[in-house]
Every structure is written in structure tokens, then in C-alpha cells.
From Swiss-Prot:
UniProt-listed InterPro entries: Ribosomal_uS10, Ribosomal_uS10_CS, Ribosomal_uS10_dom, Ribosomal_uS10_dom_sf
GO cellular component, one term: ribonucleoprotein complex
Protein name: Small ribosomal subunit protein uS10
Function field: Involved in the binding of tRNA to the ribosomes.
Single GO molecular function: tRNA binding
Family statement drawn from the similarity comment of this UniProt entry: Belongs to the universal ribosomal protein uS10 family.
Domain of life where this protein originates: Bacteria
Organism field: Dechloromonas aromatica (strain RCB)
Subunit and interaction comment: Part of the 30S ribosomal subunit.
UniProt KW Ribonucleoprotein keyword: yes
Length: 103
């Protein structure tokens, strides 16, 4: 796998889970001899929703909800076959979405 890099993008609602997963990926990649760039925290996406409290009247009375999506980006430069195998075997928490691209 000469002159290739792996780009990993993590997405989660809980920042603690995403930081823990990023740390596990960095440790695994460094253990196999690859060079890791990151994790780079990307801007947090905030979705806001306004919901009526009452089903009938009181239009002015509303609940405001927010969902925050945290993102991290990592590049693994010059990965070996051992690096790819170790990343495939890595067990990450269920709340973390992982996108892996070979470039």
C-alpha cells in the first residue's frame, strides 16, 4: 500500500464517545507503524427544533430541542496491511458512525 492514505471520518452525538473512539484508532494505527494526522475536530452541527407544548392552544408556549453532531477527521499516511487488518478488527462503541476512504 505504498503512497496511499486512509481518511477516517467519525460522527457521533456524544463528544466523549467520539474522542474515545478517535484515541483507540490513533493507538491502533501507531502500534502497527503508520503515521497518523489528527484527530481534527470539525465544526459541530447543531440542529434546533421548536415543538408546541400544548396540542390545542397557547401557540407562544414551545419547547426548544437541540441535537449536536460532533465530527472528527483523521488521516493515516502510508498504512501497512497490518494497519488495515487492525482497523477492521477494532471494536468501537455503537453510537459512533465511521466512514473509511482509501485515497
Amino acid at each position: 500500500m505504498a503512497n496511499q492514505k486512509i481518511r477516517i471520518r467519525l460522527k457521533a452525538f456524544d463528544y466523549r464517545l467520539i474522542d474515545q473512539s478517535a484515541q483507540e484508532i490513533v493507538e491502533t494505527a501507531k502500534r502497527t507503524g503508520a503515521v497518523v494526522r489528527g484527530p481534527v475536530p470539525l465544526p459541530t452541527r447543531k440542529q434546533r427544533f421548536d415543538i408546541l407544548r400544548s396540542p390545542h392552544v397557547n401557540k407562544a408556549s414551545r419547547d426548544q430541542l437541540e441535537i449536536r453532531t460532533h465530527l472528527r477527521l483523521m488521516d493515516i499516511v502510508d498504512p501497512t496491511d497490518k494497519t488495515v487488518d487492525a482497523l477492521m478488527k477494532l471494536d468501537l462503541p455503537a453510537g459512533v458512525d465511521v466512514e473509511i476512504k482509501l485515497q
